From Swiss-Prot:
One of its GO terms (cellular component) is cytosolic small ribosomal subunit. The gene is rpsR. Part of the 30S ribosomal subunit. Forms a tight heterodimer with protein bS6. Pfam families: Ribosomal_S18. This is Small ribosomal subunit protein bS18. Binds as a heterodimer with protein bS6 to the central domain of the 16S rRNA, where it helps stabilize the platform of the 30S subunit. InterPro entries: Ribosomal_bS18 (IPR001648), Ribosomal_bS18_CS (IPR018275), Ribosomal_bS18_sf (IPR036870). The keyword Oxidoreductase does not apply. Belongs to the bacterial ribosomal protein bS18 family. GO terms for molecular function: small ribosomal subunit rRNA binding; structural constituent of ribosome. SUPFAM superfamilies: Ribosomal protein S18 (SSF46911). Keywords: Ribonucleoprotein, Ribosomal protein, RNA-binding, rRNA-binding. GO terms for biological process: translation. The lineage of its organism: Bacteria, Bacillati, Actinomycetota, Actinomycetes, Frankiales.
Length: 78
């Protein structure tokens, strides 16, 4: 019996490269919330589709935003 053909998932495109965004602002919490899980963790590159440079920028912006108390460190209590 032959194996079924396995489709490769389509590669996600970096949102920031597509829109030519040069600076990710830590005060833009509505944008940054898209890159945070419901538990408050920063989502991985393979999940969000960001390139490596913009993933680093997002992580830095999220950390700065948490430090300024604009975003929570965790979202749910255990």
């Amino acid at each position: 019996m032959a194996k079924a053909a396995v489709r490769k998932p389509k590669k996600k495109v970096c949102v920031f490269c597509k829109d030519k965004v040069h600076y990710i602002d830590y005060k833009d919490t509505s944008l940054l919330r898209k890159f945070i899980s419901d538990r408050g963790k920063i989502r991985a590159r393979r999940v969000t589709g960001n390139c490596s440079q913009h993933q680093r920028d997002v992580a830095t912006a999220v950390k700065n935003s948490r430090e300024m108390a604009l975003l929570p460190y965790t979202s749910t209590a255990r």
